[in-house]
Amino acid sequence: MNNLYQRDCLRLLDFTSLELQNIITLAQKLKQYKKNNKEIQLLKKKNIALIFEKESTRTRCSFEVAAFDQGAHVTYLGPGSTHLGTKESIEDTAKILGRLYDGIQYRGHHHSTIEILAKNSKVPVWNGLTEKFHPTQLLADLLTIKEIFPERKFYEIKCAYVGDAHNNMGNSLLEAASLVGLDLRLVAPKECWPEKNIFKFCKEQIKNKKGNIICTENINEGVKNVDFIYTDVWVSMGESQEVWKKRIELLSSYQVNSLMLKITNNPQVKVLHCLPALHDQKTCTVKSILKKYGFKNGMEITDEVFQKNQKIIFEQAENRLHTIKAILVSSLLKTIKF
């Protein structure tokens, strides 16, 4: 019996440490099947609803391709294409979608919305991103880390997340570290540290593992001897210019660049980025943002560092597909048989 059957994935703490690592192991197996053109369609006749209140590239494509690979059908419900929370309550929408579909993905503005969907739909609900958590991204990150260091335990791996940690990525990184025992350093100004309650909880949980979690403003302390430096964009579309200005001023000295890599004292240090990255000026939008705030060579990461690490970064992005596929298979099948 598959103990993840009919389970939601709203945040990583929905799983135990063993369950999380089993998902990663399943993702490795599914990835190998796809690479060898030996995909086994386990989700035939399954129907999946994809609710996107926010635009998406990697998340939407990963859910759609994962479903198609496994023989499932999807319905894309984009921004403004449903009555969710406007003409119809979230509860009512959840109840009808739960009757029509075998599972629901939600990517939107409020974590409370996905909690209501999960409570009322009676089918598995998966979090493609909310303001609180981004669990499917961290599943891909853990798979990527495991692929690079297959022989190491997670507690033997040091990862510094540099930048804004007061967001869904910071929260999900904390939860991931507390479950697998990663040695995690959140390197940011205090204003960009995670909420105290989730940090305190995850710090307490990791005591049962061999890893560690710290927050520090000190870049030298935070990145010394790490195996990975991880970063994300500092600004999001839809936020006010005032928010952008304040955050960029806070984070300007936390750019991932060649000097920071030298500070690690690890010539083999790897760089992760969950994308999109403001590393070059090849789009009008990014070009105008970088020019406005005085950046000539990328914002949160320089183009030089991005290009040197692009193989890992794009592998990390591809791993969204394989880990999401593992979540779909795990939650929609009573028994997983290959």
Curated annotation (Swiss-Prot):
Record bears the keyword Cell membrane: no
Listed EC numbers: 2.1.3.3
Classification lineage: Bacteria, Pseudomonadati, Pseudomonadota, Gammaproteobacteria, Enterobacterales
GO molecular function list: amino acid binding; ornithine carbamoyltransferase activity
Compartment(s) of residence: Cytoplasm
GO biological process, one term: arginine catabolic process to ornithine
Cellular component aspect of the GO annotation: cytoplasm
Purpose: Reversibly catalyzes the transfer of the carbamoyl group from carbamoyl phosphate (CP) to the N(epsilon) atom of ornithine (ORN) to produce L-citrulline.
Metabolic or biological pathway, per its Swiss-Prot or TrEMBL entry: Amino-acid degradation; L-arginine degradation via ADI pathway; carbamoyl phosphate from L-arginine: step 2/2
Positions that bind carbamoyl phosphate: S56, T57, R58, T59, R107, H134, P135, T136, Q137, C274, L275, R320
Pfam families in alphabetical order: OTCace, OTCace_N
Gene (UniProt): arcB
Catalysed reactions listed for this entry: carbamoyl phosphate + L-ornithine = L-citrulline + phosphate + H(+)
Family statement: Belongs to the aspartate/ornithine carbamoyltransferase superfamily. OTCase family.
Binding site for L-ornithine: N168, D232, S236, M237
PROSITE patterns for the chain: CARBAMOYLTRANSFERASE
InterPro entries referenced in this protein's UniProt entry, alphabetically: Asp/Orn_carbamoyltranf_P-bd, Asp/Orn_carbamoylTrfase, Asp/Orn_carbamoylTrfase_sf, Asp_carbamoyltransf_Asp/Orn-bd, Orn/put_carbamltrans, OTCase_ArgI
Name the UniProt record assigns to this protein: Ornithine carbamoyltransferase
PANTHER family: ORNITHINE CARBAMOYLTRANSFERASE SUBUNIT F-RELATED, ORNITHINE CARBAMOYLTRANSFERASE, MITOCHONDRIAL
Alphabetical keyword list: Arginine metabolism, Cytoplasm, Transferase
